Amino acid sequence: MSKRKRVLVKFSGEALAGENGFGIDTAVLKFIASEIKELIENDIEVGIVIGGGNIVRGVSAAKDGIIKRTSGDHMGMLATVINSIAMREALERSGLEVRVQSAIKMEAICETFIVGRAQRHLEKGRVVIFAAGTGNPFFTTDTAATLRAIEIGSDMIIKATKVDGVYDKDPKKFKDAKLLKSLNYEKAMSDDIKVMDDTAIALAKDNALPILVCNMFKAGNLLKIINEEEAALYSVVK
């Protein structure tokens, strides 16, 4: 019997806002839930990390000096908890079993992150959503996602974005931008390529964790990527 694949999918908070640019678009939640359900139905174990930028970004909140950076980051962590609860509701409504685990204790709302418990949930076919980042300021949710992926023994981390993958330059500004199907960790950390922050990429490199970047709004693409189908559209950093 072949080993089941285990993946961690990272969604940005901004993506949850849809066209509104702020808050949570329930139509986006419903779409993501259908994509995750397809993975579970194909015997794939799924962990999720969601950013909080649709509600508040720690760096932006601290920009004018009124709010300290540490407080801004704590606000950002709480924003990820809000998004995680919303995602849990959408996934449960689609018929899936879900657990939210927070890096910060809030027992009345969700479980506290314990790696062994998270792994057991995954083995039982439950989706696990990891909230509150790493629990520490100055670390992005990309770094938190990479850390959790390594801790749970994920085969890969998938960064689900609004574009088809990693380009050699901004495809919104340059019509001749080219999609890079594969690139190494060093290239991914270069100034002209923005995949994740350098801390997240360095962590992935040190642990040989592949980073796959794809468009979250292409139906069925997540499953195609995990199954390594030719029709899958994504970039891989390894």
UniProtKB/Swiss-Prot annotation:
Q: Which keywords does the record carry? A: Allosteric enzyme, ATP-binding, Cytoplasm, Kinase, Nucleotide-binding, Pyrimidine biosynthesis, Transferase
Function in brief: Catalyzes the reversible phosphorylation of UMP to UDP.
Please state what the protein is called.
Uridylate kinase
Which family is this sequence assigned to? Belongs to the UMP kinase family.
Q: Which residues bind UMP?
A: G52, D73, T134, G135, N136, P137, F138, F139, T140, T141
Classification via Pfam families: AA_kinase
Positions that bind ATP: K10, F11, S12, G13, G53, R57, T161, Y167, D170
Instruction: Write out the annotated subcellular location.
Output: Cytoplasm
How this chain assembles, per its entry, is: Homohexamer.
Involved in allosteric activation by GTP as annotated region, ranges: 18-23
If you read the UniProt record, what top EC class would you report for this enzyme, in one word? Answer: transferase
Q: What is its main location?
A: cytoplasm
By what means is the activity of this protein regulated?
Allosterically activated by GTP. Inhibited by UTP.
Report which superkingdom the organism of origin falls in: Bacteria
| Native species | Campylobacter concisus (strain 13826)
Does the record carry Transferase as a key word? yes
Q: What is its EC number?
A: 2.7.4.22
Question: What NCBIfam families does the annotation carry?
Answer: pyrH_bact (TIGR02075)
Question: Gene Ontology cellular component?
Answer: cytosol
- UniProt catalytic activity: UMP + ATP = UDP + ADP
**Which GO biological process categories is it annotated with?**
'de novo' CTP biosynthetic process; UDP biosynthetic process
Q: Which GO terms describe its molecular function?
A: ATP binding; UMP kinase activity
